Amino acid sequence: MRIAFVVLLGAHGLIHLLGASKAFGWADVQQLRTPISALGGTFWLVAAILLVGAATCFALGAQWWWWFGLPGMVLSQVLIAQSWSDAKVGTLANMVIAIPLLLLLLDARPGSFRSRFARDRDALMALPAHPMSLVTETDLTILPPLMQGYLRRVGAIGRPHVRNLRVTFDARMRSSATSPWMQATATQYEFFNPPARLFYMNATRTGMPIDIFHRYVGSAATFQVRIASLFSMVDKSGPVLTRAETVTLMNDIVVMAPAAVLDLPFTWKTIGERALLATFTNAGNMVSATLAFDAAGDLVGFLSSDRTQEDAKGSRNVPWSTPISGYREVDGIRIGALGDANWVEPSGEWTYGQFEIRSIAYNVTR
């Protein structure tokens, strides 16, 4: 779908060169019978540049592609109206181009998930913050040996304690083991004093844009999904969801900001040569998970029975697993950049989410 839109946008822009060619005598354009002045030809050329520029920006994933696309589409339609008998079919292309532009407009309104996400982020960023001291070997003495080794491997020693993080993902999601995958991108902010989590995802299913917003601030979590920023698919809240989101928060901490365990209410119990039982408490919710480490000391597995699976029949406790791999250095920290989200059902384990970290930054101000 993305490629098709880029091709349409780019081709539509290039076609406008016909108007410029006719006006400046670059070519004998028999398809355009309406006379075009030199000034008119300049406008046709500008429309071509704007639309091709928009296609290029869209192909590169630039969010501001509409800076070119919107004026290009408007100018294009004005020119088409002036040469209606020859160019009216171009209106169909402009109608298609108008759809994502309309969705962007809806996304910018105050009640959209994107706007709410930004307001929550700014409010949490505005909370008083104190300078963060550096993590030392002495700090690690409160942890079991497996966690000490893990923090050394990720490179936490000598870096500041973690106040917050910002991470972006490429992702694939599906609703069942047999459902088709939908592509997605996501941005997440995590705060650790006090703990909070904001997760905003854009996905596409059969060409339809879907917005997903997880919000866990204070003692309550919400989970909402909308189609095209307008039509609600999911709107959940309450203690069961908050407990499940506490597990997600715990997972994010040990995977993406392991040094934050030094400043949060975690307890530990060694249950094997390469496994720990970790317990985390937040907002009255105490949740646990088994952390598995490989021979090198990297965290490779997280398994919790305190998370609920939501389906058409309601919610039920199902073991939740997140295998972790693809360790590499990101923003000076060595983390597992690849992760799956799995449900471990009696019939077997299946993956409903696959995530790859594109970027991560710690102690951010924006």
Task: Give, region by region, the residue ranges found by the protein language model.
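Flexible, processing/modification-adjacent segments and terminal tails
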Residues: Q224-N282, S315
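Gly/Pro-enriched, hydrophobic low-complexity segments
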Residues: L277-V364
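N-terminal mature ectodomain segment of secretory-pathway/periplasmic proteins
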Residues: Q148-F231
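Short amphipathic beta-strand and strand-loop transition segments with alternating hydrophobic
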Residues: Y189, P265-T270, S325-G326
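N-terminal leader/targeting segments and the immediate start of mature chains
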Residues: F113-R166
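Short, hydrophobic/aromatic-rich segments at coil-to-beta transitions
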Residues: H161-T168, F192-Y200, I271-T279, V300-G301, ...
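Short solvent-exposed loop/turn micro-motifs enriched in small/polar/acidic residues
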Residues: W181-Q183, V261, I271, A283-M286, ...
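Membrane-interface extramembranous regions
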Residues: M1-S112
